[in-house]
């Protein structure tokens, strides 16, 4: 049990998270990301990540 007032602070939000979610919702992009990584897969489908 961890007291929510103690412990590590919340991690910084990932600036790429919205793009990661877009890629995850596209089955082809999501599959490609499993092989070559999210940023490269996103770039191939949508342009610059």
From Swiss-Prot:
GO CC terms of this entry: cytoplasm; extracellular region
Residues reported to bind Ca(2+) 1: 17
Residues annotated as binding Ca(2+) 3: 24, 30
Top-rank lineage group of the source organism: Eukaryota
Similarity field: Belongs to the osteocalcin/matrix Gla protein family.
Organism of origin: Capra hircus
Any one GO molecular function term: structural constituent of bone
One BP annotation, GO: regulation of bone mineralization
Xref: InterPro entries: GLA-like_dom_SF (IPR035972), GLA_domain (IPR000294), Osteocalcin (IPR039176), Osteocalcin/MGP (IPR002384)
Subcellular location: Secreted
Coiled-coil regions listed in the entry: none
Post-translational modification: Gamma-carboxyglutamate residues are formed by vitamin K dependent carboxylation by GGCX. These residues are essential for the binding of calcium. Decarboxylation promotes the hormone activity.
Modified residues (4-carboxyglutamate): 17, 21, 24
Transmembrane segments: none
Amino acids binding Ca(2+) 2: 21, 24
Disulphide bond pairs: 23-29
Record keywords: Biomineralization, Calcium, Disulfide bond, Gamma-carboxyglutamic acid, Hormone, Hydroxylation, Metal-binding, Secreted
Domain named Gla: residues: 1-47
Function noted in UniProt: The carboxylated form is one of the main organic components of the bone matrix, which constitutes 1-2% of the total bone protein. It acts as a negative regulator of bone formation and is required to limit bone formation without impairing bone resorption or mineralization. The carboxylated form binds strongly to apatite and calcium.
Hydroxyproline modification, residue list: 9
Name of the protein this chain belongs to: Osteocalcin
